[in-house]
Amino acid sequence: QYSDVTTEVVQYLQGRVDACLQAGFAPERLLLDPGFGFGKTLQHNIDLMRDLQTWMAHSDYPVLIGVSRKTMLGQITGIDIPEERMVASVAAALASIARGAHIVRVHDVKETVQAVKIWQELGVWA
């Protein structure tokens, strides 16, 4: 249950960062994963993605986004079979990168790399 998913996830992640630093982890060994799909509704996931650039601006750590083949993509597209969500997964990866994600976890590496190369070459982002 979230009343403000973005704020609550950011606060949770900051708590985890603080705990890691107190436990002696080097800051350069940390990255953040907002946990798309884990205990969140479709709207929560959409809000997190739409707010990604905003909340990342307040973080000193790289962000990993893993939405490949997720249920949220099936809910948006109406495609029930995860393996058939490649196009949606590539689109979500591009949206994540466009919003500043440092790392994207994907199943369809070749297809995602092709899409990223096209976006880079066409100047969608540098």
Where do the protein language model's features map onto the residues?
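Active-site-adjacent loop and "lid" segments of alpha/beta metabolic enzymes
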Residues: Q1-A23, E28, G39-A126
